[in-house]
Amino acid sequence: MTLNICPEINAISNEIISTRRDFHKYPELGFNEHRSAKIITKKLTAYGLDVETGVGKTGVVGVLNPKHTGKTIALRADMDALPIQEMGDVEYASQNDGIMHACGHDGHMAMLLGVAKVLSEKPEHINGTVKFIFQPAEEGYGGAKYMIEDGVLNGVDEIYGAHLWNYQPHGTIGVKSGPVMAAADLFTITIKGKGGHGATPHGTVDAVVVSSHVILALQTIVSRNTNPLESTVVTIGKINGGYNFNIIADNVVLEGTARAYTEKNRQLIKTRMHEILTGLSIAFNAEISLEYEDGYPPTVNDKSCAEKLLHSATKIVGAGAGEPYLSMGGEDFSYFANEKPGCFFFIGSSPKDQEPLSTPHHCSHFDIDENALLVGSSVFVQFIRDQLI
């Protein structure tokens, strides 16, 4: 596969890779990205951008051509790492115990800094404004919401973000209109029965038996209530209950996650869960309660934005640009895309000589093909030039 890497990106390839490795070596959890923010601030300032710090707590924003009256396009990279102990044997392995960049956010920051450097070299050629958003706390804390509350989208016409994606090989770009990441909700179900001796079940309400019916019944939401062509997931990931082999449990707690690509199916899951649990409560004479917490909404790409991004990506990777490998993961870029037209795309980064999925995201051995950084940076540069030159 022939790749058309942007010459200016190619010229600073070592810097981009080195920056990524530095971020990887010193990862920071959500809303604690202080070292990362200082590095980003220093580089953006050196590039001549207008820089604002402390946006959304620990976020950084750099603006190129802030006084231009033309269109404003925002590019976003997330900054935070995960509470994982790195097990990979690489020279740039995490030096922060129990913290690891296991999802590629180190690369996202490095790419966007590379793009900022290239575009800032000839700002007079940019017929508009580019806002570089370095967002904290994507991993579960919803850092995007805090940045929006601090006004990061003021004056923005469109917003774009990307994710290094080990589910696709290097040299590919995945982009499409419509939903590309799922709503990611969580729930806790508490079942209260009546305990007793295992030899006298007739005087009890067995919370373990009730929980088994709950688990099976919830699976019918996906198999019988939602359109099989519309991806949805209901997963019970944790069960806690019981005391001993001969004691009937009076209490069981289930924890799980619900995922959907559309808001319609998200609400359907929630409604059916309440209905099913109400029915089972009556059937088994047990008290069943549901705590349902909305997570990130679905990430839905604007059709026009996706088409424009695909056009630019094709100039870099040719036939390697096309439909992404979709997952049911959640992404708080969705908050940005709900406020402004936007597009979230995927940069194939599966390590060399490995099949996609060999080193999945959130894995203690996670790593990427660092050449993907050059592809992603080139797509961003090409896109800005296509739109603002």
Residue ranges and their predicted role:
Residues 23, 62, 75, 105, ...:
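Divalent metal-coordination and catalytic microenvironments
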Residues 60-61, 82-84, 88-100, 107, ...:
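Histidine/acidic-residue-rich, glycine-tolerant segments that coordinate divalent metal ions
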Residues 46, 212-389:
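Metal-dependent amide/peptide-bond hydrolase catalytic core
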Residues 52, 131-133, 289:
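A structural signal for isolated positions on well-ordered beta-strands in alpha/beta enzyme cores
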Residues 74-76, 187, 344-350:
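Non-cysteine beta-strand/loop elements that form the S-adenosyl-L-methionine
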Residues 2-101, 106, 110-126:
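Acidic/His- and Gly-rich active-site-bordering loop/insert found
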Residues 13, 17, 37-41, 112, ...:
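Hydrophobic face of alpha-helices
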Residues 65, 78-80, 135, 190-194, ...:
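Solvent-exposed residues in well-ordered beta-strands and their adjoining turns
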